[in-house]
Amino acid sequence: MSKKKMAITLSAMLSATIIPSFTMDVHAEKKEETKNTKIELENGMTKPIYSLDEAIMDENLYVETEVDSDQDGKKDRVSIKVMRPKTDPNVKVPVIYEMSPYRSGLKDVPVYNVDEELYAYEGKPYGAINLGSYGNYYVPRGYAVILGESIGTGKSDGCPTTGDEQEILGTKSVIDWVNGRAKAFTEQGEEVQANWSTGNVGMTGVSYNGTLPNAVATTGVEGLKTIIPIAAISSWYDYYRANGAVIAPGGYQGEDTDNMAEAVLTRENPEVCGQVIKELTAGQDRKTGNYNDFWDKRNYVKDAKNVKASVFVVHGLNDWNVKTKQFAQWWEALGENNVPRKMWLHQGGHGGTSSNNWQQTQNKWLDYWLYGIENGIMDEPMVDVQRENKTWQKIKNWPDPAAVPSKIRMYLSNKSVNLPLSMGSANKVFSFLDDAQIKSNQLVANPELEVANRLVYTMPVLQKDTRISGTPKISITGNIDRSVSNLTALLVDYGGAKPEIVTRGWMDPQNVKSIENSTAIQPGKDYTFTWDMQPDDYVFKAGHQIGVVLIASDYDYTIRPKAGTKLTVKLSEVTLPIVK
């Protein structure tokens, strides 16, 4: 590991807005039994009727989990705080729940040095909890808010395990407690029951805090009615890897599951987790980047069949930390399993959105799923997409059902001034050299010039606006003069004030057959490499050009080996999901 320091991404809270209208009293009913509730509605949403000053605070409760992640012979307990409205004795309230590894802050820990050689496969060629805006907004509207510290963090027991079953079960235990299936205790050891709750729980959060709802939903736990994952991970492999390549979350070069766990390891006596960290280091297999059992246990997409809660996905189309593949594959899997769902895709980066009446929409969603209020939220089109001009577009599904995969043979612009050469011409061969120290924004500039470290392919000038919705893919046939390299494809919008990298994708050529196994690459031998870029929903304006830039290493994301590897490209094509 290098001496560099890292700061892991933090979660965000949500703003609050109140809209006036008429009022009414309602009662919500669970299948098993009737629960008395007392709320009032305005515009189909709960309105604030409970005093925040009189709210009941249950601080420093400890919920007993099913796991012993620190292997001390005792079940881990997770620390939570509860804020709920002061109600009549027989009135029950549902719960909005956020679990987080970040509440007690982050430690500065070393990250991996990425300025190093790639590994060649040897084989025969073939902080204090603040209930904040959740509590301020929802408690007066008849909700309890629970904020927890995940295993190994803050006042909780155990060790952080970066997304595996132990972390999932530790988070799930709070829902079990709310429904009478787990025990919780005060600091003095007195048992506490959640007899004030209807048992209906909605989980939410941003980033890691939004990832845990995805994970817990795959357990099918009873009582979890809905989740709102914002900028959330659905598969940890795709957070730290891509098609066999070791890939960094945007802005956090050198981060991986082990130093992530070290950064959030804020419990007392953190040294007891030393063995757990070592197991993370071994399991993540940073050397090959292959998908293995370690990553499979942290893949929630494959377990979408177990999800019983509804899901409201929120993600930024320009999120290069938790990249867009995370929402796209999760959304697809949920649809395949008929999970009730809704999605907002905004133009921001890593985080949520406050535009498009977000707070009111979230309020209605929670009211529908936790109080059973018929407010029309499920009658809306499933997907809202924010366009580049900040307006919002409603569509039936995502990718847009009108998107058609279109195979395109591009035009090479930087090898011939007078005669564009078809990328698909069998008798044409083009080469470029890897230099990992040159950043991608430099490599996409001036597409008309010949640059040794890239190939630029451009389409003719667009005669009309052209929208993509889905996952671009690229396929190239060619060879490498070494047994190891990176491969990177950049989809670029040419024609504005400066080139804009719309999306990108990476591959380890040694994973030419699968992400599970590396294949030894024979220098000079032709292979066909096919890989995906990150999904997107983007409009190329009329008068612009769509470009594909091929490079080897990507400074901000890949391992950065020594310069000089030569890549030769012969036949290639790109497939774009173009909306007709």
UniProtKB/Swiss-Prot annotation:
**SUPFAM superfamilies per UniProt:** alpha/beta-Hydrolases, Galactose-binding domain-like
Is Hydrolase one of the keywords UniProt gives this record? Answer: yes
Pfam families (UniProt xref): Peptidase_S15, PepX_C
The answer to keyword 4Fe-4S applying to this record is no
Provide the alphabetized UniProt keywords: Aminopeptidase, Hydrolase, Protease, Serine protease
Single GO BP term: proteolysis
Q: Which reaction does it catalyse?
A: Hydrolyzes Xaa-Pro-|- bonds to release unblocked, N-terminal dipeptides from substrates including Ala-Pro-|-p-nitroanilide and (sequentially) Tyr-Pro-|-Phe-Pro-|-Gly-Pro-|-Ile
The name under which this protein is listed is Putative Xaa-Pro dipeptidyl-peptidase
Tell me the organism: Bacillus cereus (strain ATCC 14579 / DSM 31 / CCUG 7414 / JCM 2152 / NBRC 15305 / NCIMB 9373 / NCTC 2599 / NRRL B-3711)
